[in-house]
Design a protein with these regions (language model features):
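Amphipathic alpha-helical hairpins
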Residues: 1-165
Length: 165
């Protein structure tokens, strides 16, 4: 892409970046989920992958609505988070058990917080650009992510972390 000079161009560039981010997170979760031992955690990770796929379809729709070629732009930020997630949940992680589940939740939340930040930013851009429907849809995606994050926190605090002690 050429040099960005307008908020509109930045908006589309960020949408494409988020698409890549989502794809990378789903790939990471697909590798991590089989290592989770708490049944509720496994279920939550599977549900999350479906939610991320839904948000990815939204991103594609929003990119297309801007008259842009529907393609993603590789997100190096998520690439780093995914590398850390794999390291801490597979490569250098306990084989199984509550400590591993706690690590999985921690890494999931790091990646999710990146998504919350990115989607929140593009939602604000959409508002400034008076793309009201985009703003509303992106805001709903942020709410979904917050809810997922809160559910992971509840699981960690009510079960996994105490089991890991």
């Amino acid at each position: 892409m050429s040099k960005i000079s307008t908020l509109q161009e930045l908006y589309v560039d960020e949408l494409k970046d988020l698409w890549s981010s989502n794809d990378q997170m789903v790939q990471a979760l697909s590798k991590i989920t089989p290592h989770a031992t708490h049944s509720k955690l496994v279920s939550m990770l599977e549900t999350s992958k479906k939610g991320i796929a839904k948000h990815t379809e939204l991103l594609k729709t929003l990119i297309e609505a801007q008259g842009e070629k529907v393609k993603k732009e590789h997100c190096k930020g998520m690439e780093g988070l995914v590398a850390e997630a794999i390291k801490h949940t597979i490569a250098e992680a306990p084989e199984k058990g509550a400590v591993l589940d706690a690590a999985i939740i921690a890494q999931y939340q790091r990646m999710t917080h990146y998504g919350i930040t990115g989607f929140g930013t593009v939602s604000a851009f959409a508002k400034a650009l008076q793309l009201h429907t985009d703003h509303q849809q992106l805001g709903a995606a942020v709410k979904d992510m917050y809810q997922s994050d809160e559910l992971m926190t509840e699981l960690a605090e009510s079960a996994v972390n105490t089991e890991a002690v």
